[in-house]
């Protein structure tokens, strides 16, 4: 603006006046903009959250915002710039090459599942140099991946890719047994169980038993694919190098006579293995396992005994649970068929069978014969001394408050009130307990049941003992209950 004023108006004074006017106008505009900005921020404008360098519209203020941006950008650029790299010396190169070559060796890859996983993940077998630099033993030597990549240029067994960021072996990585990947070799064992091979194993005139066995295996497995080799392994003899490393995993190798059938394709070995699995369902046949897969596991004797004990414990727990359920069912059945139900059918054959089974299972089942008419088909007079002594201390189902319903049967309510002093109502047969309860109810003077002798001899107007609704019923022409030693026998 000032340069344009100087060109149009050559006079120096005029130029000064124009500059002053422009400056005043700019100041006024700045003040108006500041007032508008203040009012906007007061009204909740989002511009109030902006920094001063980016929120101003004046000609002087933008320099602050741009300067801050330039400064931050320069700092980021400096952070992105990596420090100056220098090539390592020969000693460091040698140590790095030796360490990483050991990482990629067969001996280490067979044990190092992590590195082997990264080798298998890449189709070409490359592994990141940065990943190798992060390994503990390499990190002690250098932390710069460029130093590691420079050292790997001098390796004989390793090679880098085009951008020198990944490395791989020059030779392919073999298939290790612990990878559980199918291979081309099939291990056939238990050869003596095959009927055909057993016939071939008999002494031959020409003595070529091993050749006969190999011919039989070629004929058997040749239908699945092309076979490259068949080897018979004798126990106690030295194993080939490629079989020696799997002998620790497959216990059949070296301990019994077995055969190694190697196919030219993996699919053929897989098909042959599937065929042998179906054929070896019966124990009287030879078996096969695909080398590279997990060997068949045999349960040790301890586990078998443990399984037998666990099975026996399970059967015992089931029998105990069944016993508890039977006892609960017996209690429900006896209460359902008790004397509180006037419509109960004592001659029901189903109830008789249920109670007979309960009496056989439970040693205390004979105690319920005084409470339930369905518990025994026989009858017995109350005058029996044994029945009196045992019947006094028995608990009547009328004492179960949860099963009584006085509103439905007033007769039951009346009888319970009349016979409340009997020992069958109270859980305990002790006379002192009965006296205390009768004193609380205010019926001690009216009730003659305080005496244990009277409670045994008291009878109602119907001729029944106190607390008994009716006598047990049984078939006609019977003499009552048998003695204690004959009670377990069924009545005919």
Swiss-Prot record:
UniProt keywords, alphabetically: Acetylation, Cytoplasm, Nucleus, Phosphoprotein, RNA-binding, Translation regulation
GO term, biological process aspect, one: positive regulation of collagen biosynthetic process
Secretion signal, residue range per the UniProt entry: none
Domain HTH La-type RNA-binding: 86-177
N-acetylalanine: modified positions: 2
InterPro entries from the UniProt entry: La_dom_prot, La_HTH, LARP6_RRM, Lupus_La, Nucleotide-bd_a/b_plait_sf, RBD_domain_sf, SUZ-C, WH-like_DNA-bd_sf
Chain intervals with Acidic residues compositional bias: 24-37
Pfam families named in the record: La, SUZ-C
Domain notes: The RRM domain mediates the association with collagen mRNAs stem-loops.
Reported function: Regulates the coordinated translation of type I collagen alpha-1 and alpha-2 mRNAs, CO1A1 and CO1A2. Stabilizes mRNAs through high-affinity binding of a stem-loop structure in their 5' UTR. This regulation requires VIM and MYH10 filaments, and the helicase DHX9.
UniProt feature, compositional bias: Basic and acidic residues: 483-492
Phosphoserine modified-residue sites: 56, 58
Gene3D superfamilies cross-referenced by the UniProt entry: 3.30.70.330, Winged helix-like DNA-binding domain superfamily/Winged helix DNA-binding domain (1.10.10.10)
Species assigned in the record: Mus musculus (Mouse)
Residue ranges constituting the RRM domain according to the UniProt record: 184-296
Principal location: cytoplasm
Subunit note: Interacts (via the HTH domain) with VIM/vimentin. Interacts (via C-terminus) with non-muscle myosin MYH10. Interacts (via C-terminus) with DHX9.
Protein name in UniProt: La-related protein 6
Tissues expressing this chain: Expressed in numerous tissues. Highest expression in heart and brain, intermediate in kidney, skeletal muscle and testis, lowest expression in testis (at protein level).
């Amino acid at each position: 603006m000032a340069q344009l004023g100087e060109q149009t108006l050559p006079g120096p004074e005029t130029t000064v006046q124009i500059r002053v006017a422009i400056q005043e106008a700019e100041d006024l505009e700045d003040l108006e903009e500041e007032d508008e900005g203040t009012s906007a921020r007061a009204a909740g404008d989002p511009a109030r959250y902006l920094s001063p360098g980016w929120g101003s519209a004046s000609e002087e203020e933008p320099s602050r915002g741009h300067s801050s941006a330039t400064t931050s950008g320069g700092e980021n650029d400096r952070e992105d710039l990596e420090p100056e790299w220098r090539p390592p010396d020969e000693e460091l190169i040698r140590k790095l090459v030796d360490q990483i070559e050991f990482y990629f060796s067969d001996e280490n890859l067979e044990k190092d599942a992590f590195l082997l996983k990264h080798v298998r993940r890449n189709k070409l077998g490359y592994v990141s140099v940065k990943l190798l630099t992060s390994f503990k033993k390499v990190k002690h030597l250098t932390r710069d991946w460029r130093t590691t990549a420079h050292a790997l240029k001098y390796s004989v067994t390793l090679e880098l890719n085009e951008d020198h960021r990944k490395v791989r072996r020059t030779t392919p990585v073999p298939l290790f047994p612990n990878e559980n990947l199918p291979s081309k070799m099939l291990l056939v064992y238990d050869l003596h169980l095959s009927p055909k091979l057993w016939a071939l194993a008999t002494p031959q005139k020409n003595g070529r038993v091993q050749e006969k066995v190999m011919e039989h295996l070629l004929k058997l497995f040749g239908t699945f694919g092309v076979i490259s080799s068949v080897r018979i392994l004798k126990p106690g003899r030295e194993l080939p190098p490629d079989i020696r490393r799997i002998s620790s995993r497959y216990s059949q190798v070296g301990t019994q006579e077995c055969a190694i059938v190697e196919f030219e394709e993996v699919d053929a070995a897989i098909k042959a293995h599937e065929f042998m699995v179906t054929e070896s369902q019966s124990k009287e046949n030879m078996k096969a396992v695909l080398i590279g897969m997990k060997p068949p596991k045999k349960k040790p004797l301890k586990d078998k005994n443990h399984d037998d004990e666990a099975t026996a414990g399970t059967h015992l727990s089931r029998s105990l649970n069944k016993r508890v359920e039977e006892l609960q069912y017996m209690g429900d059945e006896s209460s359902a068929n008790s004397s509180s139900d006037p419509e109960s059918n004592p001659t029901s054959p189903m109830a008789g069978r249920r109670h007979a089974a309960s009496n056989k299972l439970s040693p205390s089942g004979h105690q319920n014969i005084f409470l339930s008419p369905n518990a025994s088909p026989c009858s017995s007079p109350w005058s029996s001394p044994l029945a009196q002594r045992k019947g006094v201390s028995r608990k009547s189902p009328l004492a179960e408050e949860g099963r009584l319903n006085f509103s439905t049967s007033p007769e039951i309510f009346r009888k319970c009130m009349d016979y409340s002093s009997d020992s069958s109502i109270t859980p305990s047969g002790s006379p002192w307990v009965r006296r205390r309860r009768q004193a609380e109810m205010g019926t001690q003077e009216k009730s003659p049941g305080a005496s244990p002798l009277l409670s045994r001899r008291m009878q109602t107007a119907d001729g029944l003992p106190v607390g008994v609704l009716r006598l047990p019923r049984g078939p006609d022409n019977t003499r009552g209950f048998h003695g204690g030693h004959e009670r377990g026998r069924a009545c005919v």
